[in-house]
């Protein structure tokens, strides 16, 4: 099995957006929602309209809250632009509360993992990216959360990892970047 990596360069992410958007809106939104939420692909492909709608029929953060008794929740809100794109997509495609968000055009059933893989892998190949697969989406989310300053322990809990080293390896942080300096001037 090939080792997949996060997509670290934001220009590569933008290129993936463009490639997928040109193919179709569903594939673009699958990718965008995946890298903005860190949801497992098995969860993503089974999302329904109700999972991304509030009662007032507007987009909300996907029901993607990590919970453990005694520990506060971790919320991952969606960017407003993504919410608007999801709203428009659902209206255009007639996706109701009980309909799958990312469904096969032929069967109206959820995309299979194999279909999702082909979508992401083909777009990556078109953009000259190697070592990109479905797990890359979750890794991309975690990597960019780490780069934006989200504490590693929060990312570890969100991903369900047992150790910090597992999380660092998952997001492909080089060993030389793993040193943390605490300097106090009391």
Name every feature range the model reports, one short phrase each.
Residues 1-186:
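Conserved catalytic core of the tyrosine transesterase superfamily
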């Amino acid at each position: 099995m090939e080792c997949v990596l996060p997509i670290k360069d934001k220009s590569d992410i933008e290129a993936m957006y463009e490639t997928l958007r040109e193919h179709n809106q569903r594939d673009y939104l699958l990718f965008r929602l995946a890298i903005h939420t860190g949801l497992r692909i098995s969860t993503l492909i089974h999302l329904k309209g109700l999972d991304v709608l509030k009662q007032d029929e507007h987009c909300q953060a996907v029901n993607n809250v990590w919970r453990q008794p005694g520990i506060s929740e971790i919320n991952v809100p969606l960017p407003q632009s993504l919410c608007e794109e999801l709203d428009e997509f659902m209206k255009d495609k007639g996706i109701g509360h009980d309909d799958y968000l990312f469904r096969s055009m032929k069967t109206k059933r959820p995309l299979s993992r194999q279909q999702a893989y082909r979508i992401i892998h083909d777009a990556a190949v078109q953009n000259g990216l190697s070592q990109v697969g479905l797990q890359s989406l979750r890794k991309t989310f975690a990597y960019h959360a780490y780069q934006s300053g989200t504490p590693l322990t929060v990312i570890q809990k969100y991903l369900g990892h047992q150790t910090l080293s597992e999380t660092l390896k998952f997001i492909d942080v080089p060993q030389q970047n793993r040193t943390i300096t605490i300097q106090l001037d009391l």
